[in-house]
């Protein structure tokens, strides 16, 4: 790889890490430090900011060409995806409301396992035995982390776990519902974020509206807090742009490894800021999980490099877009 190309790849990875970790930390700060305990409303703010941002990028600045979708397909394909997309984001923010960033990020590493199991159980897809074997350290690491978590909260744990299922469902549905459309992260947000806003707006208003009014009256500096909340939404959209940049600046393997290292960075930064207690065995469990995710990505990449004469598993990844980091769900959701 040329020196200039290596520099661009490194820059792309660093800015992606920066936006991703900042959004996660800001969301946790909003819930914990600002005492704004309304995950539905935070998610809705992110959807609105992402809708506006995607419109500006595509329609006003014309930095990305619009991928045209038939009106019928918008409701038949995009809307169901947007519903799962919305649930996925909300569950992530709900889990952040109740459990530490370190625990939440580790649980989300369970996504490869839930994806493989769902495809096997529901869609009856065959997987090479090496895929199953590579999931063992992920599952073991998650179990060790969960039983040794000092700030364990069952509701937050379940939200994060169901978030993994939502991520897996979204990924699987995308293969069929979005077939024929080559969406990038910006076009994905352009179509899905408005639907997600529509889906979540009324529930957020009904369930959290009165609580937000009470918070606004009781908070010593509500306007400053609202600026922080709005800023998190703007940064969440910027994250989508960073994802687009890093996908086109790195190889699949580099992207996978960088995605797993990003989780380690998020865990470390969150601990430095929030100082949530982490036991030795808890840290070991987190480490095992991340190593397992990296190994899983390596196995899938090796299977994808098989020669044409070698039997392939039906879902051996065929492109970089199928090898996005396995410990986050940035492929279709960005992080709005």
Swiss-Prot record:
Could you tell me where this protein is found in the cell? Membrane
The domain of life is Eukaryota
| Molecular function as annotated in GO | GDP-fucose transmembrane transporter activity; UDP-galactose transmembrane transporter activity; UDP-glucose transmembrane transporter activity
- GO biological process, alphabetically ordered: GDP-fucose transmembrane transport; UDP-galactose transmembrane transport; UDP-glucose transmembrane transport
* Transmembrane regions: 11-31, 38-58, 83-103, 131-151, 154-174, 193-213, 227-247, 254-274, 278-298
Q: Which keywords accompany this UniProt record?
A: Membrane, Sugar transport, Transmembrane, Transmembrane helix, Transport
Membrane topology per the entry is: Multi-pass membrane protein
Tell me which GO cellular component terms the UniProt record holds.
Golgi apparatus; membrane
**PANTHER family (alphabetical):** SOLUTE CARRIER FAMILY 35 (PTHR11132)
Q: Member of which family?
A: Belongs to the TPT transporter family. TPT (TC 2.A.7.9) subfamily.
Annotated function: Nucleotide sugar transporter that specifically transports UDP-galactose.
Designated name of the protein:
UDP-galactose transporter 1
The encoding gene is UDP-GALT1
